[in-house]
Amino acid sequence: MTQWDLKTVLSLPQYPGEFLHPVVYACTAVMLLCLLASVITYILHQSAIRISRKGRHALLNFCFHAALTFTVFAGGINRTQHPILCQAVGIALHYSTLSTMLWIGVTARNIYKQVTKKALPCPGADQPPYPKQPLLRFYLISGGVPFIICGVTAATNIRNYGTEDEDVAYCWMAWEPSLGAFYGPAAFIALVTCVYFLCTYVQLRRHPERRYELRERTEEQQRLAVPESGHRHGVRPGTPPTCDALAASQLQNEHSFKAQLRAAAFTLFLFTATWTFGALAVSQGHFLDMIFSCLYGAFCVTLGLFVLIHHCAKREDVWQCWWSCCPSRGDTSTTKPGAHPTLDANGDALGHTACLQDSPCPGKLRGFGHPPASHCKMTNLQAAQGHVSCLSPATPCCAKMHCEQLMEEEAAHIHMAEEDVYPHDPHLHDPHLHRCLKGRTKSHYFSRHQAAAAEREYAYHIPSSLDGSPHSSRSESPTSSLEGPMGMHTLACCAQADPFPMVSQPEGGDTSPGLYGCPPHLSPGPAHLEMLRRTQSLPFGGPSQNGLLQGDVREGLPFGTDGTGNIRTGPWKNETTV
């Protein structure tokens, strides 16, 4: 290839020409694909992604207007042969550019308002909740102001748009009208946005405790939280409740305020730089146009990838939405017949051990693998082992839809002879019990850790008796008890207190099942029996889970012993010699 051929490939004919540099089209297409993927994700999974309503509308409108700006630029900036089309291109570029910058300013304003927002009132306080403000004002500002500016400019003189003379090779505005109609408003918008950024940064430096965006509880959740605060362990009667921000609200956005601030500032910089290099690419000479076209392509791809990575790839809730749409990433317990199920402290199989999407764990943050220390419904042995298993607010559907069937199965199994069926107990693998506990699919980088945790839990939860025999703990335990009127389905659908308090309850925990909407009581009857939870015994010679030495069995067991040294375990006495 000769030197002349190389120049022909890398550069374009003298302006005016029909096409721009090839890198402009390629990089614009990549950016459009990234923005399109982000928009589709946030539209289809808007209820599953933890982002505020204002933030979602601002992001979607920014992506739409940015895509419109660069699409019109790449497709029509050099269409000078058609005057009417050239004027339409100039009007569209004028409107979309101002609207995109205004939506970035709206994002900066929302971040500042959230940082400077007053602390949320405690549950049960007499203060009225914050009124929900409509989003129409944002659309009137971000869409109405550019529309008015473009309308006034075009109504004054339509020739302000298009080509000013024959020597101009691009479709834009005349120089003098553009100073007051575009460059002045754009500079003012950028200045106000930077002021919002600076004020937000100062507030975050003054108040480092303000890290995440919170949302208020609904009225129903606040009513449920008021009686819950009076039944917490470790709180003396008459003590005023503490106002915990995370207890009164849930996380509204997975990203912190600092991450949102950095993302908005970097987005404004990338958009401004991309627009500037694009303008220089079509207005400069024969050699500089290639340099600025490459710079435009680099910043254009960076803008699209940054939006996709920050708003989608760096969010665990978005990853879970993506994997849920993939049919090959279904539930591993159903696709792999030889895989061992994850067992809880009672030996029951669980679909997922992590908190669900709408779980009542306000301190649970997506993307972090450390479970919160409180506010979660945990059984005693799960609290000791550090495993958190939260139930979904949709738990009452299990009791409502499958109550009749579970009561029939319970009545059928109560009269069966006791036998050692662990771990092939039909209650452990009942699909009706696990349907309401089914959680969202974990992201791909948690799969290996979850598999390893499942192996360890499967090996740990093999029941054993006090003498070390793995057969006596299940076969010698009572199958049912008349301790309470609740049905057996409450063990799978509701969080109840352990009838064998071998482990002290976690501080701040709540054993009331009313938080999840479970019925407080059922009509007593002979069919409403409650299955006793299976317990695990610890070997002698070491401290038990309640802090007592295993050498003194009488002190550590929840039931007393008779004179012969046998253990009384409840309504029926299982004679187990110590």
Curated annotation (Swiss-Prot):
GO terms (molecular function) for this protein are: G protein-coupled receptor activity
Claim: Membrane is one of the keywords in the record = yes
Indicate how the chain sits in the lipid bilayer.
Answer: Multi-pass membrane protein
Cellular location(s): Membrane
What keywords are annotated for this sequence in UniProt? Answer: Membrane, Receptor, Transmembrane, Transmembrane helix
Q: Which residues lie on this side of the membrane: Cytoplasmic?
A: 44-56, 109-137, 200-262
Tell me the Gene Ontology biological-process terms attached to this UniProt entry.
Answer: cell surface receptor signaling pathway
Query: Region entry Disordered: which residue ranges?
Result: 216-236, 463-486, 537-578
Q: Which GO terms describe its cellular component?
A: glutamatergic synapse; membrane; postsynaptic density
Query: Where would you find the membrane-spanning parts of this chain?
Result: 23-43, 57-77, 88-108, 138-158, 179-199, 263-283, 290-310
Residue ranges under compositional bias (Polar residues)? 537-548
Tissue expression: Predominantly expressed in CNS.
Which intervals of the chain form a coiled coil? none
- Tell me the residue ranges located in the Extracellular compartment per UniProt: 1-22, 78-87, 159-178, 284-289
Q: What InterPro entries does the annotation carry?
A: Adhesion_GPCR_A, GPCR_2-like_7TM, GPCR_2_secretin-like, GPCR_2_secretin-like_CS
Which regions are flagged for Low complexity bias?
Answer: 469-481
Q: What is the similarity comment for this entry? A: Belongs to the G-protein coupled receptor 2 family. Adhesion G-protein coupled receptor (ADGR) subfamily.
Q: What is this protein called?
A: Adhesion G protein-coupled receptor A1
Q: Which organism is it from?
A: Mus musculus (Mouse)
Source species taxonomy:
Eukaryota, Metazoa, Chordata, Craniata, Vertebrata
Q: Gene of origin?
A: Adgra1
